[in-house]
Regions:
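Active-site-adjacent bridging/hinge elements
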Residues: 3-9, 32-44
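Gly-rich Lys/Arg/Thr-decorated short loops/hinges at beta-loop-alpha junctions or inter-strand turns
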Residues: 40-55
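Core alpha/beta catalytic barrel or barrel-like domain that forms the active/cofactor pocket
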Residues: 35-42, 86-95
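DNA-dependent DNA polymerase catalytic subunits
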Residues: 6-19, 23-28, 48, 57-91, ...
């Protein structure tokens, strides 16, 4: 599937390119699952002592580490240097910094296309040499003849920038994927890409990472954070809410007692349930529940944090449907933008700045007094 995907990409057949990419990814997951079965004592081919599963993992790690050492030695010998050219490595991959190699061999006055072509040529050269080395290692370690094993390294991506903040936490901007020109941001393990981010905050986080990868200064990054924070105050509340589904209203909801305005809840009621019920209560209190739809189980809502208000509501859930003007006006007046920014983005930005060794910019007195860097 990987070969078919590469062929489709070169022919700019993007529909089949995406299909083959999904197929090869699914097959990769299936292969990993097969390897995992060796660690289950209930499988008929396992040994009961994790010997086979440990052998699979340790063999891969050993081959990867040997390949890392080989590539570093090769480049240091060619350039007469003593440095680590492997900037990121996993159990089955490594990312090689080639800027110094390209600049030394071909100069700095290359176009983006020329540079990518030279990188592909150099990657092929390194790949061939490293795979020959794998033949030798396989013979020495496992007594496997060259050409009879399936160990091999293949070039996958070219990146213009790479940010690593810890084990399995990185971001890279990919410009070539298996020989096909692309423009993709690939992130793993970074808080800025977590699933609880709404589209607005996630888009800002992705753009921020791109700007860091493209080498923008701390001053420029600081300004983008400050301007984004100011921009939040001009937006519709739904754009700021945390998107979530509602599943357990009936399980936790206790209707209001006589003379009471708001419902109560059973112990450990989820935040999304409380936010949805508070919206429904407000609809009934304002006698708008006949004109506007209440939130029901299965609906999607946006949870909005509120400042102290006359109803003593801490949050409210807004539905995708039309919201009454009275409730919309109330939410706009009492929406707690600082709290939303802190809960959805500030801590994630704080972690990123800490990883970069930067001091976080002052947004205003209220939002930074509890967050010292």
């Amino acid at each position: 599937y990987r070969g078919l995907k590469k062929k489709a990409g070169k022919e700019e057949d993007w529909a089949n390119y995406k299909s083959y990419d999904l197929f090869q990814h699914a097959f990769k997951i299936l292969q990993n699952a097969m390897y995992g079965t060796y660690a289950k004592n209930g499988w008929r081919y396992t040994d009961g002592y994790l010997i086979c599963s440990a052998a699979i993992t340790n063999s891969g790690q050993r081959l990867d580490q040997e390949s890392i050492n080989f590539v570093n030695q090769k480049l240091n010998t060619e350039l007469n240097t003593d440095k680590n050219y492997i900037k990121l490595a996993d159990t089955d991959s490594m990312y090689i910094e080639l800027k110094e190699v390209i600049d030394t061999k071909y100069g700095i006055d290359l176009t983006k296309e020329e540079r990518n072509q030279k990188i592909l040529e150099l990657a092929q050269e390194i790949q061939d040499a490293a795979n020959t080395n794998l033949d030798n290692i396989s013979k020495d370690l496992f007594n496997i003849k060259p050409g009879t094993h399936y160990f091999q390294l293949k070039q996958e991506v070219i990146c213009t920038g790479l940010l690593t903040t810890g084990k399995r936490r990185y971001a890279m901007y990919v410009t070539n994927k298996e020989g096909v020109s692309v423009e993709e941001l690939d992130m793993k393990g970074l808080e800025l890409m977590k699933s609880n981010m709404n589209k607005l905050f996630k888009k800002f986080g992705e753009d921020l990472i791109k700007n860091i990868l493209f080498g923008k200064s701390k001053y420029e990054i600081d300004n983008s954070v400050i301007e984004f924070y100011k921009h939040l105050k001009t937006l519709d509340p739904k754009q700021l809410g945390k998107p979530t589904g509602v599943k357990q209203i009936s399980e936790y909801h206790l209707p209001p007692r006589a003379g009471e305005m708001f419902s109560s809840f059973r112990t450990k009621a989820p935040a999304n349930t409380k936010a949805a019920v508070r919206y429904n209560d407000l609809l009934k209190f304002k006698k708008l529940d006949k004109k506007y739809e209440s939130i029901i189980e299965g609906d999607k809502i946006f949870i909005i944090n509120l400042k102290p208000n006359v109803y003593k509501l801490e949050t409210i859930g807004l539905p995708n449907a039309k919201v009454p003007d009275e409730i919309e006006k109330f939410v706009k007046e009492f929406i707690d933008i600082d709290e939303i920014f802190e809960s959805l983005l500030l801590n994630k930005l704080k972690e990123l700045y800490k990883d970069l060794g930067w001091e976080f910019p002052a947004l205003n007195e209220n939002i930074t007094k509890f967050f010292k860097f």
